[in-house]
């Protein structure tokens, strides 16, 4: 885990891509932590990988949830279509995380947080 946080602190595209390689781990807990750290980094370089994790129905729900939240934390509105699509996911943990991410994106853009209707 030290390596994960060390890479986070570098905040470079290279560090971001190195973290994304960690999604090949068998550990769902590690994959969850990587998604969390990528959200903290707020680096759009991670978005393609985070979108893949969210959209992969075989991925652990904990990882999909954290990928959605990280996508919102990054603040790039290009992820709105994926988040909208998965806000209707049958798993409430995933669907609700997508709604939270969409609300965060709306808030960052200056919209009213309470009235956002996705």
Where are these regions (language model features)?
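Amphipathic alpha-helical scaffolding segments comprising HEAT/armadillo-like alpha-solenoid repeats
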Residues: 12-24, 43-55, 76-88, 109-118
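Helix-adjacent hinge/juxtasegments
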Residues: 29-44
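Preference for long, well-ordered alpha-helical segments
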Residues: 78-104
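Core register positions within helices of long alpha-helical scaffolds
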Residues: 6, 37, 70-73, 101-104, ...
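Alpha-helical segment of the N-proximal tetratricopeptide repeat
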Residues: 1-11
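Short inter-helical turns and helix N-cap capping residues of alpha-solenoid HEAT/ARM repeat scaffolds
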Residues: 26-27, 58-60, 90-91
């Amino acid at each position: 885990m030290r390596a994960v946080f060390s890479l986070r602190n570098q905040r470079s595209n290279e560090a971001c891509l190195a973290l994304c390689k960690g999604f090949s781990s068998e550990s769902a807990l590690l994959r969850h932590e990587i998604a969390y750290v990528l959200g903290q980094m707020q680096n759009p370089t991670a978005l393609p990988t985070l979108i893949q994790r969210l959209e992969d129905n075989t991925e652990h729900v904990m990882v999909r949830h954290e990928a959605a939240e990280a996508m919102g934390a990054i603040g790039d509105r290009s992820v709105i279509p994926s988040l909208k699509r998965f806000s209707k996911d049958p798993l409430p943990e995933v669907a609700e995380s997508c709604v939270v991410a969409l609300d965060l994106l709306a808030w960052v853009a200056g919209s009213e947080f309470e009235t956002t209707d996705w």
